């Protein structure tokens, strides 16, 4: 068993629902107990969809367990088929459904529907949501596009001269972080290169559309967590190459443009020359100088975490002090990326471990998921969301892609917004006793005024307490107890006072560095001198 | 559930009305959802669900953005090795509980909450609770109940939780009759009721659940209890086992319901009619006046309830009798005829009641009837709005102070607001 406070991913059948709900004319019959219909509101409320997800649940209850739950499943499937008349159906079980072993796949086959019925086996006690989405999409593609596969050994026909190249966009699903606008942005970008989009899947595709996947020249994989398994299969069976670059960030988008242009046999340079994005100029303008080496912690799904680290480091000039993911399937990629920034990757789905890491590293900005917002709020650190899981505010009404050149503009604004603006930062360092703009106050452009008086204490103590976070809710807003530093060195009162003169958002880091310095140099009492010795020692 | 048989046999005449029973896809929450409000009500309790990732995901989704600090609930997620019997589930549970209590030493009461998976593999949580209680006594008391979807629908999770607490409530020693109010109420509502009972001279009033585990009410043969919520049959039965007597009453929704509810207590405690009128009259008049504002908006409007919380019948009674709304269909996940007898007497004779659900068929009936307002869960609300229907999402009724005189107009406003909004929006 694993103790879980927050979970980064839902169970795998939620991944299957994301595929089914993203698609049209596909129905999902799910063998699940009463109550599992909660998943509907992920789509109707968080994503604000205006239709019920195309999912029929058997919703069995205790009294059904003594009877024939298999018959219950069959009647649910029969009714769903008659009522919704889908082009294809997927069938499977939720975690409890799988324990009662009714074999939805076999049962559905025996009903003799005249449409493809695809069983989706999801090991609910081993795998999670993204794996479920990937597996479902892969099984669908295999079952529906498979019959159109060319005989083994045949080569792909050359495209007729003068005919525009065609590609599929693979990976976007329902409940994906900014998938809606990423599709628009990438479709536009491909259009400027003279490349047509054949099928976007799963989002917006019907099963009939999936039969046409083989007609494209290559595949664009936007979200490897969902689509890389299907894309690999399409490459093997239909000889379609697929893209490896994820177009999040300016450099990555440029690389992506060159990669697709190569696959399509077109010249990318005119398009790149004409492309406009404001991020590079905004980031070069002197107003952004104070962003240099801001210490940032990044966590999310592997795709967004890796892309964000690159933007943070190369395009905004931050210093990446931590990088991690909950996508274990892509742990190797994240480890490789982390090595580039000289940090050790944090591969975990344990929220408490992430929290401890953030507390230990003392970043000035956290880029993460909805869960990291919880952590950052508790520790008083600015935060922006870069990856699912996200809540309703990250399914915005406005156009808000992460991908392509407009995505880079959105990212610049989103990530810089939570940071205190330059002038205010300077003034706070100069004048500590202002009654209004005081130490630890929230940036005044965020409008909410002042942080609770105890915020500095909470953030600082967190260094010493990575394992024992404050307890009951109320405790978070009470002054945290002053716990002795986990070192041999003791702070002299003047040094403690001097420490308070260091700006709030870097103070925790300064405290930790000073203590480390004292320990390494055998200093028993930390004085003002020790503080400045350490500052000189660690000067960047 | 055995409460069903008990309810039917005892049915008095007014409640023998025709009820449609439906069985099919239920679009409802499971009992785990009760944790979302119970963890705030009993402030030093922690709710540990023993279940799957789905259970953890459910509570997290239901709690939504509400909780940004560390919540007082969590899930022990069962893994492959727990199911395969490779590890002893009881040892694992002990390890997790030890870890949890070390992390949060302020916990006084720990509920092990059963789920569908733990139920299907027959993990005996009541024995685990006994074992852990002995180990952590006296600092922490460990109890267990089931919030699984197999056994409970939404608010029935509160029933299961409270029923698990009843056997450990202290025995009352006095000989004088005392009043126990049963069911989670908002703090402000509790305080209002305390003032009213005081005015009536019913001094010894306790509330269950209490605000923390240190102030558990006592119970015994001298205890008379009033249900404040309609979804508590198991809790009531446990209280009756301890000798307490239930006072039959409608539920305290609206002026009429609140008056009937208070009167049941007044009669049981021999409060004379003149005093009752003197104490309740000002509040009744004030509530009636506040309701007037909404009568014009709501009167004659046709109302359709999908099943959700078991509050549907008392709500339908209030909306039809005090605001002249018309009832198209009143769905309830489960109908306890005995506890709802006073409500059923008041409900219009022609109201169509449905117990259980087949959501597709119910949606067909709803579309056919085109009601003015549909009360339903969040999975249905936006899709129905998109079809041009006005909806009121039902869960809010569980999270808002709606009981008592001074909340009657707030309750009416919850139903008026979506209609006003639809009328206001031009685009």
UniProtKB/Swiss-Prot annotation, chain B:
Cofactor comment: Binds 1 [4Fe-4S] cluster per heterodimer. The cluster is bound at the heterodimer interface by residues from both subunits.
Gene3D superfamilies the UniProt entry points to: Nitrogenase molybdenum iron protein domain (3.40.50.1980)
EC class: oxidoreductase
EC numbers on record: 1.3.7.7
Residues the record lists as binding [4Fe-4S] cluster: 30, 55, 116
Cofactor: [4Fe-4S] cluster
Disulfide bond entries: none
The keyword Mitochondrion is assigned to this record: no
Reactions catalysed, as given in the entry: chlorophyllide a + oxidized 2[4Fe-4S]-[ferredoxin] + 2 ADP + 2 phosphate = protochlorophyllide a + reduced 2[4Fe-4S]-[ferredoxin] + 2 ATP + 2 H2O
Pathway: Porphyrin-containing compound metabolism; bacteriochlorophyll biosynthesis (light-independent)
InterPro entries membership: LIPOR_BchN/ChlN, Nase/OxRdtase_comp1, Protochl_reductN
A GO molecular function held by the record: oxidoreductase activity, acting on iron-sulfur proteins as donors
Keywords from the named record: 4Fe-4S, ATP-binding, Bacteriochlorophyll biosynthesis, Chlorophyll biosynthesis, Iron, Iron-sulfur, Metal-binding, Nucleotide-binding, Oxidoreductase, Photosynthesis
Listed GO biological process terms: light-independent bacteriochlorophyll biosynthetic process; photosynthesis, dark reaction
HAMAP family documented for this protein: ChlN_BchN (MF_00352)
Functional summary from the UniProt entry: Component of the dark-operative protochlorophyllide reductase (DPOR) that uses Mg-ATP and reduced ferredoxin to reduce ring D of protochlorophyllide (Pchlide) to form chlorophyllide a (Chlide). This reaction is light-independent. The NB-protein (BchN-BchB) is the catalytic component of the complex.
Stored NCBIfam families: DPOR_bchN (TIGR01279), PRK02842.1 (NF002768)
Family in the record: Belongs to the BchN/ChlN family.
Description of how the protein assembles with itself and partners: Protochlorophyllide reductase is composed of three subunits; BchL, BchN and BchB. Forms a heterotetramer of two BchB and two BchN subunits.
Protein name as annotated: Light-independent protochlorophyllide reductase subunit N
